[in-house]
């Protein structure tokens, strides 16, 4: 009972929007490449940049006022819960730097198996360096 009361008080004090005590912080659907018809032109553009952790395929676009992205993790990476964990982490990183991302880009990030051993902070620093080199990240604030 005490924990529930404390949680309600904390939510009220911090003015967090909550639905059934679950914080709503989700990447909006308009920023995600979902359809195959959206993803295949990105791969066919043949503009890519890679390192030991990621490969980013990207294409410039002017039709949308914002960026769109997709994440891809191969089965060699590990079991489903490991693949889902790395995708959740990268989505959180992208969400945190979304105001700084180039709005005229569609990009697909392919995650390699070596990224499995990294912590969240290491993954974030490597991704920010990588995104700055590929000019997907406009300014690192």
Curated annotation (Swiss-Prot):
It holds the Pfam family Ribonuclease_P. Keywords: Endonuclease, Hydrolase, Nuclease, RNA-binding, tRNA processing. It catalyses: Endonucleolytic cleavage of RNA, removing 5'-extranucleotides from tRNA precursor. GO terms for biological process: tRNA 5'-leader removal. The keyword Translocase does not apply. One of its GO terms (cellular component) is ribonuclease P complex. InterPro entries: Ribosomal_Su5_D2-typ_SF, Ribsml_uS5_D2-typ_fold_subgr, RNase_P, RNase_P_CS. GO terms for molecular function: 3'-tRNA processing endoribonuclease activity; ribonuclease P activity; tRNA binding. Its EC number is 3.1.26.5. NCBIfam families: rnpA (TIGR00188). HAMAP family: RNase_P (MF_00227). Belongs to the RnpA family. Consists of a catalytic RNA component (M1 or rnpB) and a protein subunit. RNaseP catalyzes the removal of the 5'-leader sequence from pre-tRNA to produce the mature 5'-terminus. It can also cleave other RNA substrates such as 4.5S RNA. The protein component plays an auxiliary but essential role in vivo by binding to the 5'-leader sequence and broadening the substrate specificity of the ribozyme. This is Ribonuclease P protein component. It comes from Onion yellows phytoplasma (strain OY-M).
